[in-house]
């Protein structure tokens, strides 16, 4: 009898385990693709083009989630250090280096390669073109060219030891032209022709900055001119390409000298113009040259340090002399800087907005006092809206007079989200657990709703969804009707420690346009090869960043850029859903939650206490490191 009971118990346990396994299997999500990379995964980078680039012990691997095998594998240089892999901003290119940072870089062989991660092709490899030393390697956009300098083992014995510059077309992968920086075999004292900055590629010629001065060549490599303006770091040309500005950082690194050069190489100013600090913004206007430079005393690096501040200068384009008798006081870092028809509008990180005419006169009746950290400055039909971590208001863009009767003030908030509700003609601002509604015409303020999120989170997303108001953070989602009444509040417990304020979403939209545009400020200037990225746009112009990126990529005329453009023309996967990492019954996992209902549409259990993953919020793909050498992908759009 006991034996029979034991057998029945055994059968029951087996049946129970099978049922449990079946339920588990139904909840578990099978990956769409499994990639065994055959080497330890060290790092994963989600690119702006939507391709995941994985650094392994063997090299780099590109993953395109729609394909079952890796898009590319680059093991030519072996394992790469993080500093040996450069993702060129706003492009499909990766520059890979080996030996560049070695103390023997000038003696031992150095290598460079350029990978098009969209096509999965190596489009330049220094070894294939017999480059023994690569000194510099720059991708130039929007021309879509590659400029390299170094020693190429081609030609006679003198040519093989003479520094050379070559320009390659990245679309055709062919050499456009090349030239030597000095005459091969020339007898005399050896001179240092090392390149000191980024070459400037113009329509008819190229200018190369060297330790001996600027060297200009035609697009066939023919000599045009040289001058003695040495150690220029970066250059900008005006629209006509007849006037060039060169920027030279002083030897102590604390100041910048600005030079103006004509198209024939002559110096157009009697003397260079020295500005304190490093130039962070440079604008050529019809009225003159606007320059923002950031001073740093080398001590406290905080933006709130009292001795660290920006200076604004306005120079006569013809002479380089100051137009303003007295520069405006900033008392902090210039965080926003816009050229308007009547003058220059700027906002300070530590608080404050002002506007100065091109001849140096104040346009605002008095400098506008604001809270710290100006998150938003934008045009509205009523005037200039500003939103900081502490307050918000709309002011007259001509005079600085406030449009709202008084600023909306709130306690310094860890996160502030805002949007415009066109149906109700009102601005909505979420700060410090409150949603404020501000009538666009009258400026009257009301507290629409309370938004107490779990884990002390603050909403960092605020959207209008079919007439309702959606708020989101890392672990919380809430929907309000247009009267502020709660329709749902869903909370998903974070897998880590709770009880601290979290500002940024746990699942970051790393493929967002913001990433591309943020990197546009290169070489100290808040501009990119595509033009100035710091524009005072209309507030809440939905989709403008995506359209800007799509148009920018489409303008290149290359197949890879076309694919990147198509990506940003498509609807983002996060438009109607949010992806959240949380604790599930079967372990840590990712949930896809619908914004309009708060319902979980998909669960993926990762079965890992500290999962390593990336989410493409735009494309709707989860990349998960299943073990040290295996990667899973899940399509979150299904």
Please provide the spans of the model-predicted regions.
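Bacterial N-terminal signal peptides that target proteins for export
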Residues: 2-12
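A general, composition-driven signal for non-globular sequence regions
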Residues: 3-4, 18-20, 221, 597
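Bacterial N-terminal signal peptides
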Residues: 11-21
């Amino acid at each position: 009898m006991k034996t029979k009971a034991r057998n029945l118990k055994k059968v029951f346990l087996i049946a129970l385990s099978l049922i449990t396994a079946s339920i588990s299997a139904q909840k578990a999500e099978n990956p769409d693709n499994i990639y065994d990379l055959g080497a330890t995964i060290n790092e994963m980078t989600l690119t702006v083009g939507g391709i995941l680039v994985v650094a392994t012990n063997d090299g780099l691997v590109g993953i395109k989630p729609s394909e079952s095998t890796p898009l590319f594998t680059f093991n030519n240089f072996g394992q790469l250090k993080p500093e040996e892999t450069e993702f060129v901003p706003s492009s499909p290119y990766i520059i890979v280096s080996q030996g560049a940072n070695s103390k023997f870089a000038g003696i031992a062989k150095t290598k460079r390669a350029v990978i098009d991660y969209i096509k999965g092709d190596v489009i330049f490899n220094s070894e294939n073109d017999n480059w023994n030393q690569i000194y510099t390697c720059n991708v130039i956009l929007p021309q879509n060219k590659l400029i390299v300098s170094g020693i190429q083992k081609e030609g006679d014995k003198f040519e093989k030891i003479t520094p050379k510059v070559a320009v390659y077309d990245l679309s055709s992968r062919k050499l456009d032209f090349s030239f030597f920086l000095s005459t091969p075999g020339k007898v005399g004292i050896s001179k240092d022709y090392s390149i000191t900055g980024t070459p400037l590629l113009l329509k008819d010629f190229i200018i190369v900055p060297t330790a001996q001065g600027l060297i200009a060549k035609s697009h066939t490599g023919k000599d045009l001119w040289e001058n003695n303006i040495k150690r220029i770091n970066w250059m900008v040309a005006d629209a006509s390409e007849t006037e060039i500005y060169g920027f030279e950082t002083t030897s102590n690194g604390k100041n910048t000298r600005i030079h103006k050069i004509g198209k024939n190489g002559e110096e157009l100013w009697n003397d260079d113009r020295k500005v304190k600090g490093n130039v962070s913004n440079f604008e050529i206007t019809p009225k003159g040259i606007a320059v923002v430079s950031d001073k740093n005393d080398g001590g406290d690096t905080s933006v709130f340090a009292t001795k660290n501040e920006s200076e604004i200068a306005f120079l006569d384009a013809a002479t380089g002399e100051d137009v303003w008798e007295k520069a405006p006081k900033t008392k902090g870092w210039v965080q926003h800087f816009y050229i308007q028809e009547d003058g220059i509008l700027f906002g300070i990180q530590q608080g404050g907005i002002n506007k100065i005419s091109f001849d140096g006169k104040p346009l605002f009746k008095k400098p506008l006092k604001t809270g710290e950290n100006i998150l938003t400055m934008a045009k509205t039909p009523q005037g200039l809206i500003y939103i900081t971590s502490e307050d918000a208001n709309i002011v007259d863009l001509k005079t600085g007079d406030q449009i709202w009767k008084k600023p909306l003030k709130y306690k310094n908030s860890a996160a502030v989200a805002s949007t415009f509700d066109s149906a109700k003609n009102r601005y909505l601002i979420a700060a410090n657990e409150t949603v404020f509604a501000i009538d666009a015409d009258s400026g009257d303020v009301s507290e629409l709703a309370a938004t107490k999120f779990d884990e002390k989170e603050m909403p960092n997303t605020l959207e209008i969804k079919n007439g309702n108001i959606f708020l989101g953070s890392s672990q919380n989602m809430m929907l309000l009707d247009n009267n502020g009444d709660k329709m749902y509040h869903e909370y998903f417990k974070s897998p880590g420690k709770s009880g601290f304020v979290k500002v940024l979403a746990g699942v970051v939209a790393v493929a967002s346009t913001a990433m591309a545009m943020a990197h546009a400020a290169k070489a100290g200037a808040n501009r990119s090869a595509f033009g100035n990225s710091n524009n005072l746009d209309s507030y809440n112009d939905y989709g403008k960043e995506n359209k800007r990126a799509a148009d920018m990529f489409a303008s290149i005329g290359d197949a890879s850029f076309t694919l990147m453009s198509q990506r940003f023309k498509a609807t983002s996967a996060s438009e109607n859903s949010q992806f959240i990492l949380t604790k599930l019954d079967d372990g840590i996992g990712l949930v896809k939650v619908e914004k309009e209902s708060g319902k979980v549409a998909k669960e993926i259990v990762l079965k890992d206490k500290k999962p390593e993953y990336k989410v493409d919020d735009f494309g709707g793909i989860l990349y998960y490191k299943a073990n040290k050498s295996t990667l899973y992908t899940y399509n979150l759009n299904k």
